Amino acid sequence: MVIIRLARGGSKKRPFYNIVATDSRNRRDGRFIERVGFYNPVATKGEALRIAQDRLTYWQGVGAQLSPTVERLVKQAQKAQPAA
């Protein structure tokens, strides 16, 4: 099953997450099919969250499931989208 979830990057104490479409059997930071966006929780300036909505809807259309955290981030991005 394909799942859209976070893959951790960055250094110690400075997390950075890629939002990726991957097979659910792969490791958290292992091989992925496509990078759909990113989330930077420690960003002070610039953008902390970017999601390619067209690719996200494509993957959901072919049956990919969102992890609970990615669901929350997608709602957050959609809420911020009309304000921008």
UniProtKB/Swiss-Prot annotation:
GO terms for molecular function: structural constituent of ribosome. SUPFAM superfamilies: Ribosomal protein S16. It comes from the Bacteria. One of its GO terms (biological process) is translation. Gene3D superfamilies: 3.30.1320.10. GO terms for cellular component: cytoplasm; small ribosomal subunit. Belongs to the bacterial ribosomal protein bS16 family. This is Small ribosomal subunit protein bS16. It comes from Burkholderia mallei (strain ATCC 23344).
